[in-house]
Regions:
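N-terminal signal peptide c-region/cleavage motif recognized by signal peptidases
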Residues: 14-18
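Active-site-proximal loop/hinge segments that shape catalytic or ion-binding/gating pockets
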Residues: 164-265
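A cross-kingdom marker for long, charged
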Residues: 245-306
Length: 306
């Protein structure tokens, strides 16, 4: 009887392991998941970047559907009727089927127990989390890049994540924090704000872009820049609640970024300015576009929250 019980237990365990292996999504797969199921791999985001998007969506609601479609790898939104609902995909259409443009999709790593860890998309998904009519239960499609579910424990899992540079273990002051202090969910109430991360975002195409030569942009690229800039820029010198002060801060960040030689290291990131897409000359026209089209939304949304 004891032998039978032991054998049965082994069989059940083997079947459970096999079932988990079969159900665990593998690298390259595209899967649907609710935002609340995603575990962040960073404790901070740039709130101002998200404020810009939320302000834009409030003024032009159709832009939220563009965000949804593009993030699902479906191109822009196609037909968006007046009563379309982000939580009901059948109420509107996107240009292409899910996953047609995988390069635009957000990415996850599968961890122990099948938990999904978001590695790219914290800003886009927090924007949708905070968007009226979307929220934590909104379902989105993501792309699996790695399966680390066979890690024997969380300590090993996080070691693998750090080795692969798929986790950002710093707070909004640039201080190191342990994986256990990462938030369990997205959203403003769970994440910290890193203003420098936002300022770097607003220099995109003006001071940095996609790495050249076909190189793949490292995860957390803007955070590497922001963490270095923490030692270079005194944000206290700028009134970030006024458009003029915010523009001046963006320009100061942009000028400092382009001052780095292509081969120069960006702080202790382990990457050079070239590897992080750094430009050698400031693109004034792109900077002016940001000043005119993005900064006003940031300032207005900041005021609406006070």
């Amino acid at each position: 009887m004891r032998w039978y019980t032991w054998t049965a237990a082994l069989l059940v365990g083997a079947l459970a392991t096999q079932a988990q292996a079969l159900s665990t999504p593998g690298p390259g797969q595209v899967i649907e998941v609710a935002l609340e199921q995603l575990h962040p791999t960073q404790a901070v985001v740039g709130f101002d970047q998200i404020y810009y998007s939320l302000g834009l969506f409030a003024e032009k609601p159709a832009k939220a559907f563009d965000e949804y479609c593009e993030t699902n790898g479906q191109g822009a939104a196609d037909k968006v009727p007046k009563h379309a609902d982000l939580r009901q995909p059948s109420s509107f259409t996107c240009q292409d089927p899910v996953g047609t443009h995988p390069e635009d999709m957000k990415t996850v790593v599968v961890g122990p127990g099948g938990q999904l860890y978001l590695t790219d998309g914290h800003h886009s998904f927090t924007t949708l989390w905070e968007t009226p009519g979307a929220g934590p239960q909104l379902k989105m499609w993501v792309k699996v890049t790695d399966d680390f579910s066979n890690s024997p424990d969380l300590a090993t899992f996080w070691q693998r994540m750090q080795a692969a540079r798929k986790v950002w273990l710093k707070d909004n002051r640039g201080q190191t924090l342990p994986p256990a202090q990462l938030p369990a969910h997205l959203g403003f109430k769970n994440l910290q704000d890193d203003t420098l991360r936002s300022l770097v975002y607003f220099t995109r195409k003006a001071a940095y872009g996609k790495p050249e030569g076909g190189d793949i942009a490292p995860e957390f690229l803007e955070f590497y820049w922001g963490n270095w800039l923490r030692t270079q820029i005194d944000l206290g010198a700028y009134n970030l609640n006024k458009k003029s002060g915010y523009k001046a801060a963006i320009e100061a960040v942009a000028r400092r970024m382009v001052s780095l030689a292509p081969g120069a290291p960006v702080g202790d990131s382990g990457f050079s300015a070239h590897q992080l897409g750094g430009m050698t000359q400031l693109d004034r026209s792109e900077l002016e576009k940001t000043f005119d089209k993005k900064v006003p939304y940031v300032i207005d949304y900041r005021k609406s929250r006070n």
